[in-house]
Amino acid sequence: MDNYTSDEDIDEDFDTQLIIQQSLQDIYKPGTAQHAPKDESLHSFLSADYKKIVETIEKVGKEDALSHLTKYHSAFGEADEIGWIPLHKAAVQLNRKILEITLSASDPSLWEQTTHNGETPLFLAVSSCLLENATFLLLNGCNPNAKNFEGNSPLLAAVLRDCYDMAALLINYGADVNLRCANERTALHEAAKLGREDMVKLMLVSGAHPDPQSTYGFTPLALAAQSGHTEIMEMLLRKGKIFCLASDSSSILLEAASGGNPDAVALLLEYGADANIPKNSGHLPIHVAADRGHLLALKILIPVTDLAAIKQSGISPVHCAAAGAHPQCLELLIQAGFDVNFMLDQRINKHYDDHRKSALYFAVSNSDLSSVKLLLSAGALPNQDPVNCLQIALRMGNYELISLLLRHGANVNYFCRVNPLHFPSALQYTLKDEVMLRMLLNYGYDTERCFDCPHGDKVHPSYTVEGWTSTVIKDTKFCEVITLSWLQHLSGKVVRVMLDYVDQVRICSKLKAVLQKQGIWSEIHFILTNPRSLKHLCRLKIRKCMGRLHLRCPVFMSFLPLPNRLKAYVLYKEYDLYGQGIFTGTW
């Protein structure tokens, strides 16, 4: 090989290096080009010939002008800031003649060059649904299987654009109908998902496998079932298998249930689909239909689902309907005989921070009054969860929800499992609201425990933080809570209401010191230092003999041999603010 270099060559190299150096210096000159946008910098390196070519390509009726520019061969290889060469520009123009001129002027090595998104000229023509351009490029040997950087093929792009003729053209020129694209999906996957019936027929006739599984294990049939495309499902069912499971063991019937099309569900059952195959999470098709609120699909699935499979799953469709706030589905399930007191299995409820168990808890958490009424009327028990349903309703301050739960036996004397107080926990949510406070007290709240203090008239021990122990909040007395600096102003009103529900009580020195500063102290002092009325004492005695559960039971009260006026008195109807239509209880 001849390694000789002439002086002329050295001079040319020197000139070239000097030009490059000056260009770089201009780019990094302070306060100027270094702050220029990236696309402007790239645009400045494009030749004038390139700009002329592109301008001519993008103007209609400029074939002759473009022909005169074909002599600038190197300009046809230049790319703009998004990687488009003139051939890419020509591929998306309506004028096929422009594309022919540009292709002939471009080096064959550029015919498969990609943009920054990995798109070839053919891919762009297909995406633009330009059939003549795509035909010309295919005739000149362009690859019909060249995928872009997202992993999509020209055939898949034709399916997405719903361009049947384009898809047929690509297949005729060798496009692989079984080519795996993004997430291992084929063109048949997309056609089935989008409901392109003619495309699905074309793919199947052209040799597409009917059951390819995507990265997540979905077949075209599963995707068609999700969207409820029954005609496509029937085509695929004749060709493929119904028993393919996704990577999470989700059956095709479960996917149909999630879509909610009753015809799709019925079709799969007709072809032998099993409604008792759970996915990895344990959910069955009936669970998914109930959770999504697909009433018609649920009607079909109820008779074909085994109760043993539901029990094994650890969750009832009643839970799902309540969680999704679908009272119509809930009513259907109750009418079908599903147990409203079915409790979540431990392996399911451990995924919830509150370890909820009952369907009623889901409904209460959603403030779904319709579902709560249905469940309680069907016999749902309100005291089955680690966190009491009443506590959730009190925290939300929902009067109607609280009233519903109390009328159906919610325990007003529950204790929180974490840091329990000496008095029942429900009271802490009602200190600022007389309506809620009266509700609790009317339904048998243990008011006497609020006045239970071992220190009596003695000086109370002081803590590191006023009102709280230095370690765990446990067995904290009412006097320690209500005398906190941010609650003291409520103490008089709260204690005055409580006195309507107790016999003679003694208040400790700590509580008394705070009450004496309240404007209502004189009334409280009068009640504490005088005998209670006989009528009041009789009411307390009757309530104690009846018990809390009998007090809230309308049937029991109806059989009680007492005048209605006396029954109302026993039930504290004169203090039933919610029943009287008073819905603002803030002090």
Swiss-Prot record:
GO terms for cellular component: cytosol. Residues 521-576 form the SOCS box domain. Pathway: Protein modification; protein ubiquitination. GO terms for biological process: intracellular signal transduction; protein ubiquitination. InterPro entries: Ankyrin_rpt (IPR002110), Ankyrin_rpt-contain_sf (IPR036770), SOCS_box (IPR001496), SOCS_box-like_dom_sf (IPR036036). SUPFAM superfamilies: Ankyrin repeat, SOCS box-like. Gene3D superfamilies: Ankyrin repeat-containing domain, SOCS box. CDD domains: SOCS_ASB14. Keywords: ANK repeat, Repeat. ANK repeats lie at residues 82-112, 117-146, 150-179, 183-212, 216-245, 248-277, 281-310, 313-342, 355-384, 385-414, 416-449. It comes from the Eukaryota. Belongs to the ankyrin SOCS box (ASB) family. Interacts with MAPRE2; this interaction promotes MAPRE2 degradation. May be a substrate-recognition component of a SCF-like ECS (Elongin-Cullin-SOCS-box protein) E3 ubiquitin-protein ligase complex which mediates the ubiquitination and subsequent proteasomal degradation of target proteins. Plays a role in the inhibition of cardiomyocyte nuclear proliferation by mediating the ubiquitination and degradation of MAPRE2. The SOCS box domain mediates the interaction with the Elongin BC complex, an adapter module in different E3 ubiquitin-protein ligase complexes. This is Ankyrin repeat and SOCS box protein 14. The gene is ASB14.
